[in-house]
Amino acid sequence: MSMNSFGHLFRVTTWGESHGTALGATVDGCPPGVAIDAGKIQHWLDKRKPGQNKYTTQRREADEVKILSGTFEGVTTGTPVQLMIENTDQRSKDYGDIKDKFRPGHADITYFQKYGVRDYRGGGRSSARETAARVAAGGLAREAIKSIAPGIDIKGYMTRMGAHEIDRSRFDWDQIDANPFWTPDAQAADEWASYLDGLRKSGSSVGAVIEVVARGVPAGLGAPIYAKLDTDLAAAMMSINAVKGVEIGEGMSAAMLTGELNADEISMGRDGPQYSSNHAGGILGGISTGQDIVVRFAVKPTSSILTTRKTITKSGEDTEIITKGRHDPCVGIRAVPVGEAMMACVLLDHLLLHRGQVGQNQGHIG
C-alpha cells in the first residue's frame, strides 16, 4: 500500500492499524531548533483520544505519544521525527462475526477489491484511529509554526450536527473548550446533547460539519497554479476519514451570491490593506490574503450502527450484518482536533515553501 504521506517540505507519513501493536507518524522536514517534548504533543492528542465522555467511542486508549527520534536536548535536530502511539485497548473479538462480510458504508469492500486482502479488525488502516498519528504530527507542526510565525492561532469547532446548526449570533470562542462538542454555541451544545443521547441509545449515528479557522496567517502563502494553499488545504481535509465535502470561505454558497456581494472590498488601513468581508476565506488565487483562513468540512454519519443492514460476503452471497463493537455516534466530535492538525501541517508546509522561494521579500503596499 502506497500513498501514506502528505506534504511538500514538511512531509508526514503515517503508519499503523486500528488493532495493531502501535501506530504513528514519521515527520520529515521539520526545521531544526524547535523546542519540543512529548507533553506539548500530548496536549493535542488528549483532545482527540477516545472514551472521554458518553458521546464518543468507549474504547479506552491513553494515546500516550513517544518521540523516538529527531530530537536532542529538547529541540528538533532537522532529522526525521518518529512519533509512536501504542494501542492498548483493542477488542478484536468484536469483529469476528464480520470477517467474511463487508460493512455497508465502510472501506472494507474497496480495500478488498483493490488489495485482495483486508484487516477486518476495526477497519485496519482505514479506521479513524489512524488520525491519532496526524494529531501528533500536527502538535509538532504547531510548535514549529510558533518559531517561524508566532502570531498564528488555529481553532476548530463544530457548526452542525445532523440538521441542527449553531446560531452564529451566539458565537463565543470561549465556549468551544467548555462543552463535549467543541461548539461555540452553548445553547446548541445543550440541544445536541439531548439529540445525541437518543441516537446513541437507539444504536444510530449522525454526521456533522466542522469549521477550522487560522488567524494571524501572513499574506503570501501558497502559489499559483498547482500549489495553491486552498488546494492543499482541501486535499488535507478531504483525506480525513469520513469526510465527504470541503469548503473554503463561502464555499458552495458563493454560487448563490452576486459579484457585488461575493467580492471582498478593499481599503487602506493603518497597517496595510483591510477587507470589508471574508467571503474568500482568506485566500485569493491560491495565495493567502492576510485574513483569517476559513475551512469547513462535512463528516458523514458513522457507518457502524446497531441496525441490521443488507450486505454481501467475500464469496458473493447476500447476507445481513450488525456492526458490534465500540463506535462514535457522531465521529465529527473527534474530527475537530484532526482538522486543526491538518491545518497546522499545511500552514507550516507553506510557510517553509514561502521562505524557500521568496525569503523575506514580499510586495509592500502603502
Swiss-Prot record:
InterPro entries on file: Chorismate_synth, Chorismate_synth_AroC_sf, Chorismate_synthase_CS
Cofactor: FMNH2
Regions that span the bilayer: none
UniProt catalytic activity: 5-O-(1-carboxyvinyl)-3-phosphoshikimate = chorismate + phosphate
GO cellular component terms, semicolon-separated: cytosol
Coiled coil: none
Keyword field: Amino-acid biosynthesis, Aromatic amino acid biosynthesis, FAD, Flavoprotein, FMN, Lyase, NADP
EC number of this enzyme: 4.2.3.5
GO-annotated biological processes: amino acid biosynthetic process; aromatic amino acid family biosynthetic process; chorismate biosynthetic process
Gene3D superfamilies to which the protein is assigned, alphabetical: Chorismate synthase AroC (3.60.150.10)
Binding locations of NADP(+): R48
Residues binding FMN: R125, S126, S127, N241, A242, G285, K300, P301, T302, S303, S304, R326
Any GO molecular function: chorismate synthase activity
Subunit structure of this chain's protein: Homotetramer.
Biological role stated in the UniProt entry: This reaction introduces a second double bond into the aromatic ring system.
Protein name: Chorismate synthase
Record lineage: Bacteria, Pseudomonadati, Pseudomonadota, Alphaproteobacteria, Rhodobacterales
